[in-house]
Amino acid sequence: MTPMLLSAFWTYTLITALTPGPNNILALSAATAHGFRQSIRVLAGMSLGFLVVMLLCAGIAFSLAVIDPAIIHLLSWVGAAYILWLAWKIATSPAADEKVRPKPVGFWVSFGLQFVNVKIILYGITALSTFVLPQTQALNWVIGVSILLALIGTFGNVCWALAGHLFQRAFRHYGRQLNIILALLLVYCAVRIFY
């Protein structure tokens, strides 16, 4: 992977892991309402579910690459389009609402939620088909990057849980500006895929 593509990969994965989404909001809510220690079960369920979903995404993306390598080039365009769509959604979304507080859930519920979490499914397929499979189709690399993607996602969840009220205040005061900056960084990611 070239340094430019690697920088786009890290930018995409970190922004996706750290921007608001179902997991991060749930982690924030659980830690804010019940403390970090009480939210560990929720975080553990999310993390294991995230890993399983990333491995499933690896299997799907790898299988498509084996069936027809030209699909990977097409998926790169689809991935870039998704990244641009995500940038648009982030740039035009309102700041987070600190009044929205879902009830904390347990390990198995947070594990199961990963299988319907469209954000992480698209995150996995986009990262693998856009940044990894065009460079290598070695199964050990695909699996290794899938594990890395799950670790990055877990990092994002833990950051939100640890930050608790601090992130709520930042999004309340600077949410629009932060959303625009994150959106511009995602546009950078989409451009770096091809140049």
Swiss-Prot record:
As for membrane topology, the entry says: Multi-pass membrane protein
Question: Cytoplasmic side: which ranges?
Answer: 33-46, 91-104, 163-176
Q: Decide whether keyword Nucleus is in the record.
A: no
| Residue ranges crossing the lipid bilayer per the database entry | 10-32, 47-67, 70-90, 105-125, 142-162, 177-194
Superkingdom to which the source organism belongs: Bacteria
Subcellular location as annotated: Cell inner membrane
**GO cellular component, as recorded:** plasma membrane
Keyword list, A-Z: Amino-acid transport, Cell inner membrane, Cell membrane, Membrane, Transmembrane, Transmembrane helix, Transport
- An individual GO BP term: cysteine export across plasma membrane
InterPro entries, per this entry? LeuE-type (IPR001123)
Q: Which residues lie on this side of the membrane: Periplasmic?
A: 1-9, 68-69, 126-141, 195
Keyword Protein biosynthesis among record annotations: no
An example Pfam family from this entry, by short name, is: LysE
Q: For this UniProt entry, which residues form the secretion signal?
A: none
Spell out the reaction equation it catalyses.
O-acetyl-L-serine(in) = O-acetyl-L-serine(out); L-cysteine(in) = L-cysteine(out)
Name this polypeptide is given = Cysteine/O-acetylserine efflux protein
Q: Which species does the entry assign this protein to?
A: Salmonella paratyphi A (strain ATCC 9150 / SARB42)
State the organism's lineage: Bacteria, Pseudomonadati, Pseudomonadota, Gammaproteobacteria, Enterobacterales
